[in-house]
C-alpha cells in the first residue's frame, strides 16, 4: 500500500483530545506516521491539521498564525480560565455598552505580554504546568510576548454577560488567558465560554472534514488527502533539473540564484507573517523555500545559505 503524503484537515469535535484524533487517523489510513499541528483543548472544536507520512516533517515550516471564534463569559473565575475548570468565584458584571466593551478590548490588540493559564502545557521547572496544577500547586508562570493582530467584537449580551468575538493571533497565544485578563481589567472576572478554531497553519474551516467514525474507523473510507504543496503555498519554490536533483538526493548544496525561484503562489498577508512554530530551529529566521523535483513534486525544504547557494534542510527520498 502506498503511504499517503499530505494533510487532512479535521473538524475536531468537543470532548476528545488532539491525540485522540491522531490515533483515529492512524487506524483509518493504516499507518503509524501521523502527526497534528497545533494542539486543541478537549472542549475546543474546529480546525486540526493532520499530517500523514513524511508530511509530518513539514509541520515546522507551516505558518503559525491561528484564528478563532468564541465567547467570553463575564463574572466567573475558574481554575483553568474556561468553564471546564473549578469555579473559584462568581460576581455580577457591570452595565456596559458596546463602545465600553470595545475600549476594554483595545489593550489586547497588537504585541502584548500574556501569562499562560495554570492549566496549560507550558513547562515550569521541567514539568507541565497542568500536571502541577492538578496536584493543587500554584505556580508563577512567566508572561511571554504574543501578537493579537485582530480582535473583533461580534456581539455583547448584557443580560447573559457574554462577549462573542473573532481573533487572529500568533502561535503560542492562549485565548483562555485573553478571557481571564479581560475579566480582570473589567473588574468582575471572566473565563472562556466556548471556542472554535477557524484557521491554523494556513488551513481554514472550509477545508475541514468530520472526524471518521469512532466505532469503525478502519472501515471508514479515508478522507481526501491535500497534497503537500497546498500547505506550502506561502513559500517560494525552486524547481530542480535532473543534475540538480541527483545532488539534492544526496543531501548536497545546490548552486542557484534567487531569480530562479518561483514566487509564493499565496504569500502570507501582513498579519500572518510570523516565524514558523519551531522557534528552536536554527534556520527559522532564514529565507525558506520549497524544493520541487523534475516531476513537480515536493523534494524537500531548503534555505539560502548565501545569495548563490541553497542548503538542504529536509530531503525526501534521500540517497546514500
From Swiss-Prot:
Keywords: Isomerase, tRNA processing. InterPro entries: PsdUridine_synth_cat_dom_sf, PsdUridine_synth_N, tRNA_psdUridine_synth_TruB. It catalyses: uridine(55) in tRNA = pseudouridine(55) in tRNA. Residues 116-136, 259-284 are annotated as: Disordered. Pfam families: TruB_N. The keyword Isomerase applies. PANTHER family: PSEUDOURIDYLATE SYNTHASE TRUB1, TRNA-PSEUDOURIDINE SYNTHASE. This is tRNA pseudouridine synthase B. It comes from Prochlorococcus marinus (strain MIT 9313).
Amino acid at each position: 500500500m502506498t503511504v499517503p503524503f499530505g494533510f487532512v484537515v479535521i473538524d475536531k469535535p468537543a470532548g476528545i483530545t488532539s491525540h485522540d484524533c491522531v490515533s483515529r487517523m492512524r487506524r483509518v489510513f493504516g499507518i503509524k506516521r501521523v502527526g497534528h499541528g497545533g494542539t486543541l483543548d478537549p472542549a475546543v472544536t474546529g480546525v486540526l491539521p493532520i499530517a500523514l507520512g513524511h508530511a509530518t516533517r513539514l509541520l515546522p515550516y507551516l505558518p503559525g498564525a491561528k484564528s478563532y471564534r468564541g465567547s467570553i463569559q463575564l463574572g466567573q473565575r475558574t481554575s483553568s480560565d474556561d468553564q471546564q475548570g473549578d469555579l473559584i468565584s462568581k460576581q455580577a458584571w457591570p452595565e456596559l455598552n458596546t463602545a465600553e466593551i470595545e475600549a476594554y478590548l483595545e489593550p489586547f490588540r497588537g504585541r502584548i505580554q500574556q501569562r499562560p493559564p495554570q492549566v496549560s502545557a507550558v513547562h515550569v521547572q521541567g514539568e507541565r504546568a497542568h500536571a502541577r496544577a492538578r496536584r493543587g500547586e500554584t505556580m508563577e508562570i512567566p508572561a511571554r510576548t504574543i501578537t493579537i493582530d485582530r480582535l473583533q467584537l461580534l456581539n455583547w449580551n448584557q443580560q447573559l454577560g457574554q462577549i462573542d468575538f473573532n481573533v487572529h493571533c500568533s502561535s503560542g497565544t492562549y485565548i483562555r488567558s485573553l478571557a481571564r485578563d479581560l475579566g480582570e481589567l473589567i473588574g468582575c472576572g471572566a473565563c472562556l465560554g466556548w471556542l472554535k478554531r477557524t484557521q491554523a497553519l494556513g488551513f481554514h474551516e472550509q477545508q475541514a472534514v468530520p472526524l471518521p467514525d469512532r466505532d469503525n474507523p478502519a472501515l471508514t473510507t479515508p478522507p481526501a488527502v491535500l497534497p503537500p504543496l497546498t500547505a506550502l503555498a506561502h513559500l517560494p519554490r525552486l524547481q530542480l533539473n535532473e543534475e540538480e536533483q541527483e545532488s539534492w538526493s544526496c543531501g548536497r548544496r545546490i548552486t542557484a540564484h534567487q531569480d530562479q525561484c518561483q514566487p509564493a503562489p499565496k504569500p502570507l498577508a501582513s498579519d500572518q507573517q510570523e516565524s514558523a512554530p519551531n522557534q528552536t530551529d536554527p534556520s527559522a529566521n532564514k529565507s525558506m523555500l520549497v524544493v520541487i523535483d523534475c516531476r513537480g513534486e515536493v523534494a524537500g525544504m531548503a534555505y539560502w545559505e548565501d545569495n548563490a547557494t541553497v542548503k538542504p534542510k529536509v530531503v525526501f527520498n534521500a540517497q546514500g
